[in-house]
């Protein structure tokens, strides 16, 4: 490798352009005389194929690149083909100097294009020097195939690379960075083809792991469809660590030129299409003008005869139809044609302007379709339209005068017909035959109003007849219908007059009969309503559910019922009088065969209702008698239960109250030994228990009272609930008092308090228990402590209160007071004493063993200690050591155990 670098350093073949700098970028060109074998193979194949792609245009080709260019003839031919210029006439001799002369002509031509050739001489080419021949061909490729490639002012190589990068940017797995490694997988070549000719290759089916297949596919498509010969072997590209850059650039430049030519062709086609589009648009505008002009002229031709028609119509409706058609023409048909005419002129001027701008000859419409021709036809249309409108208005005004009179007839006739509609049917009705007096009187008033209305319409009927006569005289076109209508109105008017008189007579006759019936109905209503109310009230009273709680109340109800029964004969006489009135009404209706109902308009009470309710009253009277007697018997039984319960309750209630007072007094006043007090309280308790049978008997009587639904008892102030509460309170009080004495005995024995001390404590507590309820408030307790010699500050008193009143109730019980005083005056055991005792059992060790506990303590206490003592973990600990210190502290609440 070092020797190769040295050769490259000592032997350099340089070539550059005087004015272009792209040649200075080809520093990768090997300066040594020997090429890398792989690169040489690739360059031979690529350069040979490139040369043949141009020589075939001249009908020839080369087989061996260093041999076929030795005489200079094909070299000169190659330059002529790729440049399009003629070179000097070659020498046809076969001598060496002839060949050198021809090669020099080619080299001179290359130099004339601005390429400076250094160390490349004709002799080396004639001698078949591979290195020099390939270098010369590469120089030609650079000058004629790559030099003209420029993208955004880049050099030839950079421009070609940038073109490749832009074209392949959207494709996956393609990243073109150079002209060697970036092309090894073949996807770059396939992407270039697909970008410009997506119809030739399906890029989505390509596999990056098949580089040889990708390269061969791209080369085959390029050779078959793009006229780019196969210049490389896929195996050489894939298997070479770094493919030859010149070979790749040469092959890729062919794609650039192939697709650049296609883009130029596309530009040319677009230019042609643009010109053709302008021409087609002009032709479309011409055709549209011809079509619009023809349609507009045809419409004018059809419309003018319609406007020139002056045939008059006989009716106003027909003339109004013509006027409406004309207005419809002016409103709907003409405005679009005005727009078409304006648009036609605009299109004509626009078309002429476009033709003038695009250097086309002016447009000449068909004969008769010039803008001036259309304007003339339009003027004739306007003239015909003006005369037609004047004629229409004059004719309409003439018909209006005649139609006004006919319309006046129709309006008056319609008004009269609407008024008269249904009047004959109303007058023929016999609704009064089944109407009430009020309804008949209303019918009479309504009939009087109708007669007034009938008289008022007399003038209208006369006017209708006069107008009909005038229309006949003026020879109105529809006079026959007018006469027929007028005759019907006059005939109907005569009929209405006759029917009106007959209805008045029938209404007045019916009114007199109904007035008689109405007086009877009114009298019935005045007497039936109070009597009906009396029966309803009686039924309510007889069926009323009475609730009484005493004998006096039921006796009062019985007396009221007897008074009610005494009024029944008088009520029956009133009932018969009311029924006779209704019988008189029915007699009148039957006598005159009237179709009215016998129902009374002044009363909702019917005869049948009176009969039914009277029978109901007669049934309820004996039922009420029976109910009242049964209730009287029940009240006598309830009174016996009240007296029986009251007799017992009035004894038990005071007895309980007396016992409560005795217990309360004894708890305060008892003196002497606590055991004597206990015996005395036990005797009290036994006496109370022995009294229980009296409570049970009272409960039985109370049960009977509840079953009888007796809720009050005027014979006693004690209820069963009072007795129960008092009895339970008595039992609770005696039990609590006994418990207090028992607690005092335990406290005395446990704390070593003497009976004298206990008596002093009781005396002090009773003295400061000002309300005598067994409780001292804060102030009383503080005064008690001060009286016993305690000098208390606020903090100390608060501490003591937290001991005697831990729940914050605000009071101190006697037991709490005893507990506090015993703590203050008696010896107490402490955690330190217990710890010292355990230390003795443990032989002064800080821990104790289970065996030692079982040996020194009873089995039950020993097991209790073993189960609850924690393991000892302090200094000198042994297996099974138990911590008696923590255990003892926990017994007195001084530990967290």
Curated annotation (Swiss-Prot):
Biological process annotations from GO: actin cytoskeleton organization; microspike assembly; muscle cell development
Residues annotated as domain EF-hand: 756-791, 792-827
SUPFAM superfamilies (UniProt xref): Calponin-homology domain, CH-domain, EF-hand, Spectrin repeat
GO MF assignments: actin filament binding; calcium ion binding
Domain Calponin-homology (CH) residue range list: 41-145, 154-260
Record keywords, A-Z: Actin-binding, Calcium, Cytoplasm, Metal-binding, Repeat, Ubl conjugation
Residues bound to Ca(2+) 1: 769, 773, 780
Spectrin repeat segments: 284-394, 404-509, 519-630, 640-743
Presence of the UniProt keyword Acyltransferase in the record: no
Residues engaged in binding Ca(2+) 2: 805, 807, 811
Stated role: F-actin cross-linking protein which is thought to anchor actin to a variety of intracellular structures. This is a bundling protein.
Stated family: Belongs to the alpha-actinin family.
PANTHER family: SPECTRIN/FILAMIN RELATED CYTOSKELETAL PROTEIN
Protein name (Swiss-Prot/TrEMBL): Alpha-actinin-2
Record gene name: ACTN2
